[in-house]
Amino acid sequence: MQQPQIIELPKFSDPRGNLSFIEQENHIPFVIRRTYWLYDVPGGEARGGHAYRENQEFIVALSGSFDVVLDDGKEKKTFSLNRSYNGLYVPKGLWREMENFSTNSLALVLSSTKYDANDYIRDYEEFLKYVKR
């Protein structure tokens, strides 16, 4: 299994501002099949709370900040995202939660698969059984 990691994206700066971009299979190790974003998350609320059997993700804080907590069934690791030129690669098979959203934060999520409800593991006990196989 590949490991989660922060990937620094290209950043071009000049007096007019900054520009960053993402290229599939270059900056991220998969073809993008779905894109979604999270915004207006109320203070104290968390998102995620599931794992994927097949889907991989790349998560970028386009604005503001938040934490992504990844769990492989043995240990948890927290990644703080707060720069629009850094993203977190999340391999399949990890439980994920997103928390500590700052006011007006915007999370962009790129996915390797189209939406498939059967790919989700939404129960933590079921997830623990899944990773022990």
Located regions from the model:
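Well-ordered alpha/beta subsegment
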Residues: 83-87, 93-100
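Non-catalytic, conserved peripheral segments adjacent to functional cores
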Residues: 1-86, 103-106, 110, 115-133
